Amino acid sequence: MSRVCQVTGKRPAVGNNRSHANNATKRRFLPNLHTHRFWVEGEKRFVSLRVSAKGMRIIDKRGVEVVLAELRASGVKV
């Protein structure tokens, strides 16, 4: 399963670790993803989404049914 938020599209980013001597080594910054079940009142069922913390805030603000409608319109099977 890829490390991509289904709501925001956040993906791993690439950057550098920096030591005290300022040596650079490559690293990945991973998004804060969680598999979370959301209750969809209109469908009377739970829907599992892999979302970041920011994605959960978006769902809290706009509502799960609005976000699901946008996901389905973009071709995501939910």
Swiss-Prot record:
GO terms for molecular function: structural constituent of ribosome. Gene3D superfamilies: Ribosomal protein L28/L24. Pfam families: Ribosomal_L28. This is Large ribosomal subunit protein bL28. One of its GO terms (biological process) is translation. Residues 1-24 are annotated as: Disordered. One of its GO terms (cellular component) is cytosolic large ribosomal subunit. PANTHER family: 39S RIBOSOMAL PROTEIN L28, MITOCHONDRIAL, LARGE RIBOSOMAL SUBUNIT PROTEIN BL28M. It comes from the Bacteria. Disulfide bonds: none annotated. The lineage of its organism: Bacteria, Pseudomonadati, Pseudomonadota, Gammaproteobacteria, Aeromonadales. The gene is rpmB. Belongs to the bacterial ribosomal protein bL28 family. InterPro entries: Ribosomal_bL28 (IPR026569), Ribosomal_bL28/bL31-like_sf (IPR034704), Ribosomal_bL28_bact-type (IPR001383), Ribosomal_bL28_sf (IPR037147).
